[in-house]
Amino acid sequence: MKSKIEIPRDEIIKFCQKWKISEFALFGSVIRDDFGPESDIDVCVTFAQDAHPDLYDLAVMEDELHEIFKRNVDIVEKAGLRNPFRRREILNNLEIVYAA
């Protein structure tokens, strides 16, 4: 699978370092053929053990990624994927962009 957008890797690296993200991956339509001009970008992240983001932090992160990608962004935390069906679907279809 290959993402349907250009990924500004330098900006993503800075973003991940700032927020203590150890893995940043794309999933959903951004890596499928149904990605279109109105599609958002789905991101799955894993935080470093010493990172403790709250809901406000996640909202700020989504805003920052919106500025980077110029699209709406939804973030899910890998550790927070509790539904086994959704977890399997997401984890089987990830494109890792950054890993520390």
PLM feature segments, named:
Residues 1-25, 31-33, 37, 48-100:
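Catalytic core of pol beta-like nucleotidyltransferases
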Residues 39-41:
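Short, conserved active-site loops that position catalytic residues or coordinate cofactors/metal ions
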